[in-house]
UniProtKB/Swiss-Prot annotation:
GO CC terms of this entry: centriole; centrosome; ciliary basal body; deuterosome; nuclear body; pericentriolar material; procentriole; procentriole replication complex
N6-acetyllysine PTM sites in chain numbering: 1714
Protein name per the record: Centrosomal protein of 152 kDa
Transmembrane segments: none
Superkingdom per UniProt: Eukaryota
Region (Disordered): 1-127, 571-592, 1416-1479, 1543-1562, 1574-1614, 1677-1736
Record PANTHER family: CENTROSOMAL PROTEIN OF 152 KDA (PTHR10337:SF6), SHC TRANSFORMING PROTEIN (PTHR10337)
Subunit architecture: Interacts (via N-terminus) with PLK4; the interaction is mutally exclusive with a PLK4:CEP192 interaction. Interacts (via C-terminus) with CPAP (via-N-terminus). Interacts with CINP. Interacts with CDK5RAP2, WDR62, CEP63 and CEP131. CEP63, CDK5RAP2, CEP152, WDR62 are proposed to form a stepwise assembled complex at the centrosome forming a ring near parental centrioles. Interacts with DEUP1; this interaction recruits CEP152 to the deuterosome. The interactions with CEP63 and DEUP1 are mutually exclusive. Interacts with CCDC66.
Biased composition (Basic and acidic residues): 61-82, 94-105, 575-592, 1462-1473
Family, similarity comment: Belongs to the CEP152 family.
Phosphothreonine modification, residue list: 1277
Cited function: Necessary for centrosome duplication; the function also seems to involve CEP63, CDK5RAP2 and WDR62 through a stepwise assembled complex at the centrosome that recruits CDK2 required for centriole duplication. Acts as a molecular scaffold facilitating the interaction of PLK4 and CPAP, 2 molecules involved in centriole formation. Proposed to snatch PLK4 away from PLK4:CEP92 complexes in early G1 daughter centriole and to reposition PLK4 at the outer boundary of a newly forming CEP152 ring structure.
Length: 1736
């Protein structure tokens, strides 16, 4: 049997199906995903799209009754028979299969492929769709005991090529044809999708019946059945082979993945090796650099060695010459010793010396005698001094005793004074003192008492009369019945606190009445004071009680009143209830109407009348009670006032009495004080005179003593002079010793130099030896490094070779694997091939593993080889660091040792020790002298005492006396000599030590001075070097920053240029589009005319003239015309065909249904109306063309809007970045300036300190030199014995030294005072400046506060208008006058500064402004842009936008102003921030009215200012240069009136707050010019530092609110203002995108507000300049924001016209009804106004 069984079916299938490339690419991507998946995912059994029943087949026994046979038959019918189209669609098949595909029996989409010689078949659609999911009708199947479930795997393109197999071609292929005709599949997809188990059983029964019919019909054809069974067996065999191949493929895939994984590992290792290689190369390069450095060092050392050798040779030559000279000198010395002339000179010298010594001895003896005499005189004077001292001490003691006595006296007197004062105070406090005081007062005031008593009597009588009147009133009130009945009887009311305080006791009212009767009876009698007081007290008590009673009554009345009120309220409530009941009864009566009407009305009326009467009665009672209460209140108030007056008078009397008592006491006290003072002063004067006499005596005595002491001091000075002479002699001896010491030092220095030379030679020898050893070691290291490098290179070569071999092996294995797979696909008979391939693959794998092992070993070896030098290098580095640390420690220690003597503490300790040593030496010398003298005296005394008892004869005594005298004389001579010798020794030793110390101190000072100078110089040099380095670094950084900024500016200019180019291209594209549209319109008209019958040639010329572009020609016209005609012809042919077909259809319909009338179906949309003529066709074509053109225009506009929006977003971002960069630049500049200032200040400070220190050191050096010269002069002076006038010259030398010292000290003191004074003056100046600043600030704050208060008061007056009802004009005039006064007051503060600065700025800006205006006008005239067009410009916060090219050409370039001008302008900005802002005049009308606008901006505002609208109104801004170097881009703002409404309000009526900033007078023009007409960099810097949203704050005043002139007018609208400058419209990307959606609103606005045809809607706006916005502004706003205003777009304007015509009927006159209120803002320097200035 042939194996090519089902190739025909496969070929037909391949021919019918078209191979899709996209599906093939998807399969490739899936294959890559599957190869990347792990093994666990691939081994899943349910992951393949194969059918489980692909392995199921018959067992080979047809007649055996087994249950699996039935199922196998069902499987044959199900799988061999073709599946319906609906089922395939349900399973995810998307392609309609042809009838030929359904008729092939052998086509199984999910099973294996063909293994015949037909080759690879393309993959099916089901495999692509069902790669990762099973079909919905899938059920696993097991074909009996012998057959197991097949393993489901994912499909890949290599395997899918095998999985499409069917019946091969053969001789029995024709016998299978009847199966195609008989067995058609069941096509109901819903049955198979949602089939229940019963339905499945029914279907299986049906298939069994069909199978039995088929078998019964073909029992004769048993050979064919056998053939089918054989084919099934073959299919099973093929399936098994396929399974084995699939398993092998899986193995191969796993191997491939494993190999790919290993490949990745190897690649990572390769990368690691490459990194290590790079590191090793870097190390090698570092080593080379170190070698080069070492070589350079070695060369330098060799050069030094050669220099040393040359110096050695020179030194050896010098030594030889010096040795020769020494030998010659020795010979000369020997010859001189032998010469006679020298001997004679020696003898002569010795004789002179002997004579000089004799003379010196004689002089010394004479001097010693003189000294003895002076010593004796000194001793006498010392004894006299001791006596005088004792006398002085006695006198001091006497004086102290006198002082003590005086102090005791003073203390006693003070004590007695204090006692007397205490006694006086006690007496005054006691009663006797009071009696004395009363007597004195009676004596002194005897005459005044009578007058006072009379006056008091008169006052009391007046008061009594008043009280009588009051009592009569009170009695009349009691009679009337206000008081209770028992008031005449005994009232047992307790006294109040006020009565107790006044001292009033209880008194019966009867007694008071009796008293009153007695008073009435005897009015002529004069009562005494006590009686009067008692009467008054009783009256007061009675009044107080009556007052309390009255109060009680008032409280009772108040309670009664409250009760009455409560009753009244209750009555009112009842009345209200009655009224409510009346209303209720009325309602009930209305409902019932008839029942109980008459009776209820009568009853209610009676009740109401009764209640009314009661209410009237109660009201009368209430009024009476209120009147009574008011009367009682008035009476009570009068009584209270009277009581208050009484109490006040009593208090006043009390105070007067106390004041009198105090006066008398003070007078007495002062009199006593005066007496005591007089007595004490007299005593003090006497004692003072006595003490003065005593002190004068003591002073005379002391003066005499002082004269004596002065004489003694003169003698002592003479002695001191002699001592100084001796000192000079000792100094001469010291000089000699010093010279000897210097010679010894020189010898020592020579020996030291010789030692140093020897040491140098030894060190040089050692250095040469170490050099040799180091050279040898370096050569060895170099050789080792070369060997290591060679090894590394060989290793690298080996690694590369191994990589190449491994790669080649991999490629070979992959190629062999591919070949094996291809052989398997084509040849099914060769089964042994996979085994061979697997062996080859195993061998390749083994080879790879071996190569890997070798590579790993090599890598380990290389790593170990690399580690060793790294470890050595680390050890060397650690040693170097340790050495550096040790050297640093040693250096620090040496510096510390050197700096020790420099310290102030060390010097202070040295001085203190020196002073202590000097004191100790002086004390020791004095102690020795005193000991020697005391010993001598004691010996003499002991000898005398010993001699006294031995009474001898007179001769012997005389002889003894003489002998003793001689001995005494000798001893006296010897003792001073010994003393002198000891003193001289001590002095010599002290002088020596002192001189040594002086020399040491001088040397130390010189060394310290040198070190200090060197350190100071080093420090200064270091500081200067650091400063230079910092300056260089800062300079480099600044250069880099400037370069980056320059690059940024270049990039920005490039971007702007690209934007301009894009805009130009867009403009050209628009022109082309417009030209094409015009051409098409004219051509369409021409074609219509041609079809109409008359065509004109003049239209071509008109079209040529209308088109602006040059590229349109006659040929182009002809081509376009031909194309249009062709298209029309085609359309006509198509339309005629369609019309003919429709007519035929209609005829058929008419013939079939005659009853249906065509008239009823005229409105039907499905039936097309026949076109009778060609004119209807043309109309339809023209309408279609118009629609198409409108759609294309809309699309183009949308696309351009999107592009522009994106570009504007990018532009905004770039401009923000530019602004940030400029801010950073300015900050950097400020920082640099600050650094430069600080640097200069630091350098100046250092220089000043250095100069001060140098001056101080120079002064100290001069002082030290002067001292040294004085000492040398002292040392150089010859001894006293040689010159006779030495004694005379010693005095002036000492005086000169003293004078010089005094002069130096005086100069130092003067300098110190000068410095202190300068410092004090500087500090005082600083304090004064601070005080002045504080005062100025305080004054400013006070003035600002005053102005604020005045401003608030003015505002209040303006708002209140003082309650006067005046007219509107008067109010406005008064407000204007108040504001003018405020402005004058406020303007006085900064008027002078502003005038000066404005004048300077005006001079600097006038000429460039004129040139810029001229150039701007010329360019604008050339470019043909209309200057009279008013524009609306909105300043948005934080958004700057570039201008188009045309605008940039119009605006002239400007140069950056200097820094001083910028500062001036910044200060002006701060001083003149708020500007006057006024709203529209009140005669602004809309609708039929007119909008009269004073052209303030046109007249007053310079062309450098542009009206820019913020959220609150218009502001003035400066035109800015777009292409100037270093200038910021112009604030590119859009018309807020167009786009603001789309963001905030979408309602047709939007209330606007309009403001319009104007300049009040032409006098303010220079200020604005000075402020605004600077360079763009200045304005940009100012704008960036201040708020960027210029004029974006809303004004707080909302009175001037009125509806705007358009239905879509925004909330913050503006009014047009003309200016001769050229302005442009633009907006941000966000608003453009929002406005593209809300185009209707701004179309309405543009049609009503800015369109030239706005007169149709009864809208008239009159101003000094024309307010006609062109059509292009609207088009530029609708998505072409960057374009200029010179290119109109007819489509947008036509659309707007149509929209306006639709919406103009809404009536704009109804929208503009209220006029806008005129608002006047305060003047500039006031900041609390609430108005926003345009310059903020």
């Amino acid at each position: 049997m042939s194996l090519e069984f089902g190739s025909v079916a496969l070929q037909t299938q391949n021919e019918d199906e078209e191979f899709d490339k996209e599906d093939f690419e998807r399969e490739k991507e899936l294959q890559q995903l599957l190869t990347d998946l792990p093994h666990d995912m691939l081994d899943d059994e349910l992951s393949s799209p194969e059918r489980h029943d692909s392995d199921c087949s018959m067992d080979g026994r047809a007649a055996e009754p087994h249950p699996s046979e039935h199922l196998e038959r069902k499987w044959i019918e199900r799988d061999i028979l073709p599946k319906p189209h609906s089922m395939n669609c349900g399973n995810g098949w998307e392609e309609n299969r042809s009838k030929t595909e359904d008729q092939h029996l052998g086509y199984h989409p999910g099973e294996g492929g063909d293994e015949g010689g037909s080759g690879y078949s393309p993959p099916g659609k089901r495999e692509q769709a069902d790669l990762y999911r099973l079909p919905e009708d899938f059920r696993p199947y097991t074909g009996g005991s012998k057959q197991a479930a097949s393993v489901i795997t994912f499909s890949d393109p290599q395997r899918d090529n095998f999985q499409q197999f069917g019946l091969s071609r053969g001789p029995s292929c024709g016998a299978l044809e009847p199966y195609k005709a008989v067995y058609k599949p069941y096509r109901n997809s819903s049955v198979q999708k949602n089939s229940s188990p019963a339905q499945e059983v029914a279907a299986s029964d049906m298939f069994e019946g069909l199978q039995q019919q088929f078998l019964g019909a073909n029992e004769t054809d048993s050979a064919e059945n056998i053939h089918i069974i054989q084919l099934q067996v073959l299919n099973k065999a093929k399936e098994r082979q396929l399974d084995s191949l699939v398993e092998k493929l899986k193995d191969s895939e796993r191997q491939v993945r494993y190999l790919s994984h290993q490949l990745l590992i190897v690649q990572d290792e390769k990368d690691g090796l490459a990194l290590s290689l790079r590191e090793s190369q870097q190390l090698f390069q570092n080593g080379k650099e170190r070698e080069m450095q070492l070589e350079a060092q070695i060369a330098a050392l060799e050069a030094q060695v050669e220099a040393f050798r040359v110096s050695e040779e020179k030194l050896t030559k010098k030594l030889r010459t010096t040795e020769i000279t020494l030998e010659s000198l020795k010979q000369q010395l020997v010859e001189l010793h032998h010469s006679e002339s020298l001997q004679r000179a020696r003898e002569h010298h010795e004789s002179i010396v002997a004579s000089l010594t004799q003379k010196h001895e004689e002089q010394v003896s004479s001097l010693q005698k003189n000294l003895d005499a002076t010593i004796t005189a000194l001793q006498e004077q010392e004894s006299i001094c001791t006596r005088l001292k004792d006398h002085v001490q006695q006198l001091e003691r006497n004086q102290e005793a006198v002082r003590l006595e005086k102090t005791e006296l003073i203390n006693r007197l003070t004590r007695s004074l204090e006692d007397s004062q205490k006694q006086c105070a006690h007496l005054l406090q006691s009663g006797s003192v009071q009696e004395v005081a009363q007597l004195q007062l009676q004596l002194q005031q005897a005459q005044k008492a009578h007058v006072l008593s009379e006056s008091m009597n008169k006052a009391l009588q007046e008061e009594l009369t008043e009280l009588k009147d009051e009592i009569s009133l009170y009695e009349s009130a009691a009679e009337l019945g206000v008081l209770p009945g028992d008031s005449e009887g005994d009232l047992s009311i307790e006294l109040t606190e006020s009565c107790v305080d006044l001292g009033i006791k209880k008194v019966n009212w009867k007694q008071s009445k009796a008293n009153r009767v007695t008073q009435q009876e005897s009015p002529d009698e004069d009562p005494s004071k006590d009686e009067l007081i008692l009467k008054l007290k009783t009256q007061v008590q009675r009044l107080l009680t009556s007052n309390s009673v009255k109060r009680h009554l008032v409280s009772q009345l108040q309670s009664d009143l409250r009760e009455c009120r409560e009753t009244m309220e209750a009555f009112q409530q009842s009345k209200d209830g009655d009224s409510g009941m009346e209303t209720k009864t009325d309602t009930s009566e209305k409902t019932t109407k008839q029942l109980w009407l008459e009776s209820s009305e009568a009853i209610n009326r009676e009740d109401i009348l009764q209640l009314k009467n009661e209410v009237q009665v109660l009201q009368k009672q209430n009024q009476e009670l209120k009147e009574a209460e008011e009367k009682l209140r008035s009476t009570n108030q009068d009584l209270c006032n009277q009581m208050r007056q009484m109490v006040q008078e009593f208090d006043h009397d009390k105070q007067e009495a106390v004041a009198r008592c105090e006066r008398t006491y003070q007078q007495h006290h002062e009199a006593m004080k005066a007496q005591i003072r007089e007595s004490l002063l007299a005593k003090h004067a006497v004692e003072k005179q006595h003490l003065l006499e005593v002190y004068e005596g003591t002073q005379s005595q002391l003066r005499s003593d002082l004269d004596k002491m002065n004489k003694e001091m003169a003698a002592v000075q003479e002695c001191y002079l002699e001592v100084c002479r001796e000192k000079d002699g000792l100094e001469s001896t010291l000089r000699k010793t010093m010279e000897k010491a210097q010679e010894q030092k020189r010898q020592l220095l020579e020996a030291r130099e010789e030692y140093v030379r020897k040491l140098k030679l030894e060190l040089e020898e050692k250095y040469q030896e170490t050099l040799k050893t180091e050279r040898q070691s370096w050569l060895q290291e170099q050789a080792a490094g070369a060997t290591q490098q060679a090894e590394k290179e060989s290793r690298q070569k080996l690694i590369q070779q191994l990589e190449k071999e491994w790669q080649s092996k991999l490629d070979d294995s992959l190629a062999a694997w591919r070949k094996t797979t291809s052989d398997r696909g084509s040849q099914t008979e060769q089964v042994a091939c996979p085994a061979a391939v697997s062996k080859a693959e195993a061998a390749a794998v083994l080879a790879e593993e071996q190569a890997r092992q070798v590579q790993q070993e090599k890598e380990l070896a290389t790593k170990e080889a690399l580690r060793k030098p790294e470890v050595e290098l680390e050890l060397k580095y650690c040693e170097i660091i340790a050495q550096k640390v040790e050297t640093a420690v040693q250096n620090a220690r040496s510096r510390w040792i050197q700096e020790l003597p420099m310290l102030a503490e060390y010097k202070a300790l040295l001085r203190a020790q020196q002073q202590e040593w000097a004191k100790q030496q002086e004390l020791a010398v004095a102690h020795r002298l005193s000991l020697a003298l005391s010993e001598a005296k004691e010996k003499w005394k002991s000898e005398l005492e010993n001699m006294k008892p031995n009474v001898m004869s007179v001769k012997e005594l005389e002889e003894k006396v003489h002998s003793l005298q001689k001995e005494l004389e000798l001893k006296d001579e010897e003792v001073p000599v010994i003393v002198r010798a000891e003193v001289a020794k001590a002095r010599t030793e002290w002088n020596k030590e002192k001189q040594e110390e002086i020399h040491k101190i001088q040397e130390q000072n010189e060394e310290d001075y040198r070190q200090f100078l060197e350190d100071h110089r080093n420090k200064i040099n270091e500081v200067l070097a650091a400063a230079k380095e910092d300056f260089v670094k800062q300079k480099a950084e600044l250069l880099l920053q400037k370069e980056t900024e320059f690059q940024a500016c270049l990039d920005q200019s490039r971007k702007e240029w690209t934007l301009q180019e894009a805009q130009q291209t867009q403009v050209e594209i628009r022109q082309y589009e417009e030209d094409t549209l015009t051409v098409l319109a004219y051509l369409l008209k021409d074609t219509q005319l041609e079809y109409g019958g008359d065509s004109q040639d003049k239209q071509l010329l008109e079209a040529m003239s209308a088109c602006s572009s040059k590229w349109i020609s006659v040929q182009y016209f002809e081509k376009v015309k031909a194309c249009i005609q062709k298209a029309l012809h085609d359309m006509l042919s198509l339309l005629t065909d369609s019309v003919a077909s429709e007519q035929e259809k209609r005829k058929v319909v008419k013939s079939s249904a005659d009853t249906v009338s065509w008239t009823s179906s005229e409105g039907d949309s499905a039936v097309p109306v026949p076109l009778p003529d060609s004119t209807s066709v043309r109309c339809a074509q023209s309408s279609a063309w118009l629609k198409a053109e409108a759609e294309t225009d809309k699309k183009i506009c949308e696309i351009k809007g999107l592009r522009c929006g994106h570009c504007f977003q990018e532009l905004e971002k770039e401009k923000q970045e530019c602004q940030d960069l400029r801010r950073k630049l300015e900050k950097c500049r400020r920082h640099l300036q600050h650094l430069e200032r600080t640097h200069r200040a630091a350098v100046e400070k250092l220089g000043e300190e250095n100069s001060r220190v140098v001056e101080e050191l120079i002064e100290e050096n001069h002082d030290m030199k002067n001292k040294l010269e004085a000492l040398r002069a002292l040392c150089r002076t010859p001894p006293r014995s040689l010159s006779a006038g030495a004694a005379e010259s010693a005095g002036p030398s000492c005086s000169r030294q003293a004078l010089e010292e005094l002069r130096g000290q005086y100069i130092k003191a003067v300098r110190k005072i000068k410095r202190d004074m300068l410092r004090y003056i500087q500090e005082s100046k600083e304090r004064a400046a601070e005080m002045v600043k504080a005062e100025v600030l305080r004054e400013r704050q006070e003035t600002a506060r005053k102005m604020r208060n005045y401003y608030l008061s003015c505002l209040q007056q303006i708002l209140q208008d003082n309650g006067k009802e005046e007219g509107a004009e008067k109010k406005i005039m008064s407000a204007a006058s108040k504001l003018a006064t405020m402005a004058e007051l406020l303007g006085t503060i900064a008027e002078s500064d502003c005038r000066v600065r404005c004048a300077q700025a005006g001079r600097s800006v006038a000429l460039p402004l004129a040139s810029e205006m001229l150039t701007g006008t010329e360019r604008s005239e050339r470019s043909g842009v209309n200057h009279n067009i008013p524009h609306y410009v909105e300043s948005k916060p934080n958004s700057g936008k570039t201008l188009p090219r045309s605008v940039c050409e119009q605006l002239p370039g400007r140069k950056a102003a200097p820094r001083s001008q910028r500062r001036l302008e910044e200060s002006k900005h701060r001083e003149m921030r708020p500007m006057a802002s006024t709203a529209l005049p009140s005669d602004c009308r809309c609708g039929d009215a007119s909008c009269r606008h004073s052209g303030v901006l046109a007249k007053d505002v310079a062309p450098e200012f542009v009206p820019c609208q913020g959220e609150g109104g218009f502001d003035l801004h400066e035109k800015r240069d777009a292409l100037g170097a270093g200038s910021e881009p112009l604030l590119y703002s859009a018309a807020h009136s167009f786009l603001g409404g789309a963001e905030k309000n979408s309602s047709p009526r939007c209330i606007s707050e309009s403001r319009h900033t104007t300049l009040r007078s032409p006098s303010e023009m220079p200020r604005l010019k000075a402020l605004m007409c600077g360079s763009p960099t200045e304005t940009d810097s100012i704008a960036s530092e201040k708020s960027q949203g210029v004029g974006s704050q809303d004004s707080p005043v909302k009175d001037g609110v009125g509806p705007s002139s358009s239905p879509a007018w925004p909330s913050d609208s503006t009014l047009p203002c003309g200016s001769p400058a050229v302005l442009f419209l633009g907006d941000g990307s966000q608003r453009t995108q929002e406005m593209l959606g809300d185009s209707v609103q701004w179309k309405q606005f543009s049609a009503t507000s800015c369109h030239p045809d706005a007169q149709k809607s009864n809208m008239v706006c009159r101003s000094s300049h024309t307010l006609d916005l062109p059509k292009e502004t609207l088009h530029s706003q609708q998505g072409k924001m960057g374009a200029t205003l010179g290119h109109p777009s007819p489509q947008s304007t036509d659309m707007l016209k149509t929209d306006f015509k639709r919406l103009s009927g809404t009536g704009p006159s109804s929208l503009c009804q209220k006029p806008l209120i005129k608002l006047t803002a305060p003047m500039p320097s006031q900041q609390d106004s609430g108005f926003d200035s345009p310059l903020e």
